[in-house]
Amino acid sequence: MKKIILASGSPRRKELLELASIPFEIVVSEVEETIGAYSSPSDIVMSLALQKASAVAENNSDHIVLGADTIVTYESRILGKPSNEDEAKEMLQLLSGKTHEVYTGVAIISKEKTVTFYERTEVTFWELTEEEIDTYVTSKEPLDKAGSYGIQGKGSIFVQNIQGDYYSVVGLPIARLVRELKQFDIDVTHA
């Protein structure tokens, strides 16, 4: 089996690949992410995933490199990782009681081909109290997550409904990834 390299330092993406029994190594992409003039959130996440994977693939051309990126959107506003606690609180107040979209883009690169795809998931939050938001932000959990929450952690108590791929919200649409890897002659379902 060809070696897979995850171009990410995300502990969540690492855990998801391990959950799916996909053998991999980590080489963190040091690329400066740039968002150009894209027409849609799906274009943004696929472009960022491709930037990350391409940067690592330059020095690992004999392997399969996997890059991913996740953003949260609400009413055409992109909510990335908060820069501080105040911004995290603002994002959570914005999402309180509303439905937002989570986009995760994935890029898979080998010598032979490049595949990009994305998954879109709708997440609806309960109405959040100021105390709930303050307590959560104080935990520091939201500070390294797009949209300022981790659906797999303490932020799970905010979620009223989800339509789509839960694992995509965590950071990697693992079921779709397994299917896409078959194009690269990697079939983990028989591993």
Swiss-Prot record:
The organism is Bacillus cereus (strain G9842)
UniProt-listed SUPFAM superfamilies: ITPase-like
Q: Which GO terms describe its biological process?
A: nucleotide metabolic process
Q: Which NCBIfam families match?
A: maf
Record InterPro entries:
ITPase-like_fam, Maf-like
Please name the top-level EC class of this enzyme. hydrolase
Q: Where does the UniProt annotation locate this protein?
A: Cytoplasm
Q: Does the keyword Cytoplasm apply?
A: yes
**Active-site positions on this chain:** 69 (proton acceptor)
Among Pfam families, the record links this protein to:
Maf (PF02545)
Listed cofactors: a divalent metal cation
Name the chain's protein: dTTP/UTP pyrophosphatase
Protein family (similarity comment): Belongs to the Maf family. YhdE subfamily.
